[in-house]
Amino acid sequence: MGSSNLVVIVQKEAAEGLRRQLRLAGILDPNRKIGMRGAHVLIPVSRHPGDLSGFEAEVTEDDRLEERSARSTPFELIVDAAAIEPGLKRFLPDKWEMIGDVLVLKLPPELGGCKVAVAEAYARVLGARAVLQDLAGIEGEWRVPRVEKIWGGSTETVHLADGIRFMLDPARVMFSSGNLPERMRMARISRPGETVVDMFAGIGYFAIPMAVHSRPRSIIACEVNPVAFHYLEENARINRVENITPLLGDCRDTAPEGVADRIVMGYLRAQGFLDKAMKVAGPQAVLHYHEACPNELIDTRPWSSLREAASRAGRRIELLRLHRLKSYAPGVSHIVIDARLS
């Protein structure tokens, strides 16, 4: 008996239990669909399953079962759609970031001469309205992304994450969709009655989800970049939150002192702002401090910076949590520390 057309015939009532057993045994044939013949179900198998007396089933051959159509992955469709030299297709990136309907791509230099055609292929398959080339990271305290638009129209978009709508222009302001787990954690970490100070609010990455899901008494959101500040205000409006007070300017000048029950420092080069954070903290406060740190210094440098800042301010500090979020660059990680000040 050949193996390519093997099926197991079983009564309808026993079919689902048998199908599960065959799948667990690795015998279920994924290339053919299950069929019906009157009161019986025909389950395709890749080899003889052995004794099936417990199911009152029999094994036979049947070449009439419909084959499953092969499903191409989005990347396979992109490779097929790209109108470039066949020899260049091996350089197409298999990873990308979708921010709303704007696509952000990192392209190797080999694709520099055909990047418009490449962008069009990705956009057509993924449904993007515009494509940005990531030219490596962000710049300065304003956290301006280094990108170039290579295809499409307007880059302003609305990105949905964890039930929150973020309006932004990823060509002008930073956004990382890969930080969703940390945003989800922070969204629910505050307590009713708290005053939260977000020293680097951006477009509201942490402040807006926290306002929606945790509902603290007040969130004071500081942002130095006027473009990001515009979107911070817009995101408070479109998500209908009223407990956020946006403040435009350097947080060292704008953040009120002695008021915070919780402080968020989401800027990865915030060491120079720690003295201000100590002044912003109320008598008891929790600090969430982010840093881009060389891997060999993760266990020492960030916590040492916090302890030294607390000592200068005459404060006590307790480490609650140190967590590596993701790789930031070769040999460098994005970490976050939760600490309690008293």
Which stretches of residues belong to each language-model region?
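SAM-dependent transferase fold signal centered on methyltransferase-like domains
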Residues: 1-342
